[in-house]
Regions:
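Active-site rim/loop-helix segments in enzyme catalytic domains that contact anionic ligands
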Residues: 1-71
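Metal-dependent de-N-acetylase/amidase catalytic core
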Residues: 57-212
């Protein structure tokens, strides 16, 4: 598994004593450490400024380059629209929305078309057709993956992002499970336990699956 991180993480803080450059360095290290927890093969940083991401041709080309380079059969990306329903009530990060749109446009047609971004061919990167895209955060997921055996890794990986945490370890765990009081939230996008609700699993991750 390879992660492609579009932005430099230089803006996500309320600490006025830290610079964008310092924060970017911290967050890059945190992402690498989180990747090690879950056994990533590689983490690629595209370096776009945090908070200002747009689904530009430049971003689409950079993502298409990584697709051709790593040749994924399944690609996972954020939902490319702002959902006003569900537990997050329209609070989706604009960078996530932009990266989702750029990724879908890179998957089709940019990564698979030899006449699109022909300079990628000059870099030795042949076209590649992704078979499936799994969308994170879609309001109507149709694919549920049992992650019960990997749940602890998910918790530990998230806890590596210390600069982004204002919650205790127990509070983070509670948010991830999707428990509210003593009851699991039934919304399929709310916590790993909520996503598993009624599906014979303890914890699940949910996606909208697109086949090409």
């Amino acid at each position: 598994v390879t992660y492609v991180v579009c932005t430099d993480g230089s803006k996500g803080t309320s600490d006025r004593d830290i610079t964008s450059e310092q924060l970017s360095e911290i967050r890059q290290k945190e992402q690498i450490n989180a990747g090690k927890v879950i056994g990533l093969k590689d983490v690629v940083f595209l370096g776009y400024p945090d908070g200002y991401l747009e689904p530009s041709l430049s971003l689409r080309k950079d993502i298409a380059r990584e697709i051709r380079k790593h040749k994924p059969g399944i690609l996972i990306c954020p939902y490319s629209m702002r959902s006003l329903d569900g537990p997050f009530q329209g609070s989706g990060h604009p960078d996530h929305i932009a990266s989702g749109e750029a990724t879908l446009s890179a998957v089709f047609p940019s990564a698979r078309g030899h006449l699109t971004f022909p300079d990628l061919l000059q870099e030795g990167l042949e076209p590649w057709a992704v078979k499936e895209v799994w969308i994170v955060g879609h309001p109507s997921p149709d694919l549920f993956i049992d992650i019960s055996s990997e749940f602890e890794k998910s918790v530990l990986a998230l806890l590596e992002h210390k600069s982004q945490m204002s919650l205790s370890d127990d509070e983070v765990r509670q948010r991830l499970t999707g428990w509210k009081g003593n009851k699991a939230h039934s919304n399929s996008n709310f916590g790993f336990k909520g996503r598993a609700h009624g599906k014979g699993m303890k914890y699940a991750e949910s996606f909208k699956r697109l086949r090409y």
